[in-house]
Amino acid sequence: RAETAKEMAAIMPEGDSPRRKAGAMPAEYTHQIIAEKVYEKLPEEICSHARELFPFDLGAQGADIFYFLHPFRRRNLGKIFHNEKVYETFESFRKAAVGADNTVLSYIFGYITHYAADCIFHPYVYSLTQKMVDAEPTRRVRWHSYIESDLDTYFVKKFYRKGVNRFECRLRAGKGVPKGVA
């Protein structure tokens, strides 16, 4: 338990957690920041096709938005895209990219940053989640979401030197979903 508490303290600054910010989706900011940092490093030949930031930022949220939307009530689309239809999703992107305009390409590039970030961070998040569940098996907490939210706090402080409650990601400033993405 002490080891787990120390690990959590390293990423959970007191009183400044995104889960306390109304409307903040867990890991929304982490994915946004990673996408911004990747965008800064893209070679010009790729960057020239990803100039539209709103679809790029929307893509950076990946299928996470579908965890919170349940249009079919029976199946969670977020789980389907993350766990069952990964190949199909990327295959559809490959086909859509042929001859696509910059709106579609921007979205696809953003989505790729989301997938890459999940591949890097989810093993850590799952491991830490299991430690928290083992430490407090009777406590009903969504540890996975809490840990991801606290990673948001860490990255906002690291890269923007401000509290997460004062951070506004570019996606929230966007104006609607572009036609090519919808």
Please identify what each model-predicted range represents.
Residues 24-107, 124-169:
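N-terminal, motif-rich segments that launch catalysis or mediate targeting to/interaction with membranes
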Residues 18, 27, 86-89, 177-182:
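General structural signal for secondary-structure boundaries
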Residues 113, 117, 121:
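Short active-site segment of divalent metal-dependent hydrolases/proteases
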